[in-house]
Amino acid sequence: MDYEFKKNILDGHYYCHCSMDHEIVGRWVQEEIGKESTKIAQVLALIVAARSNPTEELCLNGTEISLMICGDEVTVQDNALLHSYELEAESEFELYDCESVACCGLEDFEQLIQQWQLFVRR
């Protein structure tokens, strides 16, 4: 998974852009953890817990996007997609799955979070 971080010098907002098929991961980083050190620490602690309990699924439910870790697999999914599956609603306006869910390895995800932490501290 490739990614790039940017900071808007005019308004101070931080941005995380991830490669195609991982766009939702970038959105999750921006919208759910942002530059808040406590949230970043919470995610890093969840990664440590996942390594200690590889058979347990660990979740961090966000306002719009949620994170799930099971073993060495990380899934980031738009909450609206979860609700659309629950409701089994068929609609031409349903979210495009590829932009609403992404999976990556735990090591890649941990590296992304660590690099994000360093970037927002600058």
From Swiss-Prot:
Name of the protein in question: UPF0231 protein VV2750
N-terminal signal peptide: none
Pfam families for this protein: UPF0231
Organism: Vibrio vulnificus (strain YJ016)
Family: Belongs to the UPF0231 family.
